[in-house]
Design a protein with these regions (language model features):
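Extracellular receptor-binding modules and their adjoining Ser/Thr/Gly/Asp/Asn-rich linkers
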Residues: 1-74, 78-80, 88-95, 110-130, ...
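Beta-strand initiation motifs
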Residues: 45-51, 96-103, 154-163, 209-217, ...
């Protein structure tokens, strides 16, 4: 049933095709064709945000997060300013539209400053089923910023850690980001190396074994001052993409492709994606478009929120035209791909709207990107936003609220399968049973309350309405009968 034309008989009769039902279907139900050839009810999920839950009292900063698919939990990490800057982690459990948190666990408590905020990053190793945190141990009191990482194991609502390991032997690093290469089964850490006063961009490959991690030799990817690194993994091309602020080149937004081989990484030629001063860089891979989306604040345009599509070809990278998603000062960006909606969401602090926590949904088409209208997820001053996709269209968002406590809430991504509409059931069909479905070119007589002569369309929730949508069904010829369009 992979060829749709084979399913749509010509002519105007009662065109009906037998399908196996996925779920119980009522008579007169609009149905969508699934990839396995069965049909399911056309339905949709409404966009929304659940109630806020605190995960940290006192002041926190720099929230980062990841989803542990094995444990089915969200892991958030942050700098606890109320505890001498201790690096802290907490496990979140999503249930419906709410999230609850276990007790906080410290992974770094070095005094007097704990962890450096711009050096905090986290990735999930799907092979080892472990969380990897890369961070900077802040001893700026003696002029040193140590490169450190640690492996975390989630159990229930808690997390435990192995012994921290250096990912660089130098004494001063910053701007850390990490990503997991699922093909090489390695973690890649990008960072700025401040020794010996060069501030170059480096990357290093890590291998998780049990509760520990070991690293290869760091490799330079930018021989100039480099800040704001953000690493992501392109699973279509099996490449690491690093976007960064090239301070050595007018602070332009720049990207480069890395190839992991064993415990090393090599790089192609860098390319500029924004010939402006960029800040708050975030990136992720959009698996539906097979592109990487880079979001940033355009400091050359009053900090407007902007994004650009990156295309990887071999070891080269190219970019589409940057597109503004928020024409106001935008800070503390976060980004996550939502596979159920085939969209990427960008969270941010909307300085132009009282600093509210806001998000947009990005849709990539070719080398361009378009955006939904803004959605406010926290109508209060918000910072350090971090979205984490979990399952079933749910995104857990961690953030600092009102310059105080850390909070989390669950965002439900709007979605519908109406684009996969195939027909209307002629009769009720039990789950896994076979039944008749009227397809285009046929007539369905299982409706009620139709207005004769009116055109009807499938809505996102599966109902039929005279409100125009992208899926037109046909015209009512009686209160109970609809003449479905003949596509042939």
């Amino acid at each position: 049933m992979s060829n749709l034309s084979e399913l749509l008989p010509t002519g105007g009769g009662q065109n009906a095709v037998d399908f196996v039902a996925s779920g119980t279907l009522s008579s007169g139900q609009t149905v969508a064709l699934k990839a396995d050839g069965t049909v399911e009810a056309v339905s949709g999920v409404t966009e929304g945000i659940g109630s806020e839950t605190s995960f940290a009292g006192g002041t926190i900063t720099y929230v980062k997060g990841v989803y542990d698919a094995n444990a089915g939990k969200v892991v958030l990490i942050y700098r606890n300013n109320s505890s001498s800057g201790a690096g802290t982690a907490v496990v979140g459990t999503v249930s419906g539209t709410s999230i609850s948190f276990g007790s906080a666990v410290v992974f770094e408590s070095i005094t007097p400053y704990g962890v450096r905020g711009d050096g905090l990053s986290i990735a999930y190793d799907t092979n080892a089923q472990k969380v990897v945190i890369a961070y900077v141990r802040d001893r700026s009191d003696i002029g040193e910023l140590y490169a450190r990482s640690v492996v975390g194991t989630v159990s229930g609502t808690s997390i435990s850690f192995g012994t921290n390991v250096a990912f660089s032997s130098t004494l001063n690093v910053a701007w850390v980001s990490c990503a997991y290469d699922s093909t090489a089964q390695k973690v890649v850490v990008s960072y700025q190396d401040l020794d010996p006063g060069q501030a170059y961009g480096y990357a290093v490959v890590g291998t998780v074994s049990g509760t520990s991690i070991s690293y290869g030799t760091p490799v330079v990817f930018n021989s100039a001052s480099t800040t704001e690194t953000t690493a992501s993994y392109d699973s279509s091309n099996n490449k690491i993409v690093i976007a960064y602020r090239d301070t050595g080149n007018s602070s332009y937004g720049t990207g480069i492709v890395g190839t992991v081989s064993g415990t090393s990484i090599s790089f192609g030629t860098a390319a500029v994606f924004a010939a402006v001063t960029v800040e708050y860089l975030e990136s992720c891979f959009d698996a539906s478009a097979n592109k990487t989306l880079i979001a940033y604040s355009n400091d050359s345009a009053s900090g407007h929120g902007t994004a650009v599509v990156a295309t990887v070809s071999g070891t080269a990278i190219s970019f589409g035209s940057p597109v503004t998603f928020n024409a106001a000062s935008t800070s503390w960006l976060g980004i996550a791909y939502v596979p159920t909606a085939k969209k990427t969401i960008i969270t941010y602090r909307d300085v132009g709207n009282s600093g509210y926590g806001t998000l947009v949904k990005a849709t990539i088409s070719g080398t361009s990107v378009s955006f939904s209208s803004e959605f406010t997820f926290s109508a209060i001053s918000t910072a350090y936003t971090e979205p984490v996709y979990t399952t079933d269209g749910k995104v857990a968002i961690g953030y600092l609220r009102d310059n105080s406590n850390g909070y989390g809430s669950v965002y439900t991504t709007p979605s519908t399968n109406s684009a996969d509409f195939i027909g209307i059931t002629d009769q009720a069909i039990a789950n896994t049973a076979t039944g008749a479905v009227n397809v285009y070119g046929g007539i369905n007589e299982a409706q009620s309350g139709l207005t004769i002569g009116s055109d009807y369309y499938v809505q996102d929730d599966g109902t039929l309405s005279t409100t125009a949508s992208s899926v037109k069904v046909g015209q009512a010829i009686s209160a109970t009968t609809i003449n479905m369009m003949d596509l042939t």
